[in-house]
Amino acid sequence: MMALASMVANAQETLATWTATLNTTETVSDLQRGAPMTIDNEGNAIVTGTYTKDVAFASSYLEPIATSAFVAKYDKAGSKKWAAGLKGAATVKAVANDAEGNIYVAGNFADIVQILDGTGEQKATINGKEGVTRQVSAFIVKYSKDGDYVASKVIIPEQARNDEGYGDPDPEFIPYKLIASNGKVYLAASYQGNSKINDLTLEGKYQSLWGLYLYDVPTLAVVSL
């Protein structure tokens, strides 16, 4: 069974100017529902999602490892421009663009992920939390408007306490929203455990249940990257 993702661009309230369909997964269960997208200042559409099969998009060609993630660009007329990949166990949770057309994607990953540019060429490798197969580590990747890889950051959450009765620690850092404005990029996220971004350390919060069981409290943060 093939899974399809569809996009519609509107110039007016009820009139679609173009539509596009991407076939990126073999099954519906591998398809990312509610995948983030954005529109840049020139009217180009930046879309994201998951892929579990080879994807040909304009001159880009992406091959997956596990359930990989992609970011792709359509121009304002709906023509395919390029697609870049996060090859490995990865999910894009947020996307934004700045005034120059640069594109920022943030999300979660596990193990080893290869960052591919808009030609499908590997440009960098990121490593998640060691020994953890769940997507608890986070990435932020910057691409140029032409799909060139510019830079990346990795956030690896760490267990902050190990009290008796703590149970199985489960630190994580989950991006929710990216905003690029006035030359800066802001990230909204939730986290458990300690996470370090540049020189900023986000400290985990904990509560005790009847004084016997200590557990992580999910905490929200907005940080400037």
Question: Where are these predicted regions, by residue range?
Answer:
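A sequence-level/structural motif corresponding to short, flexible coil/turn segments enriched
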Residues: A11-L225
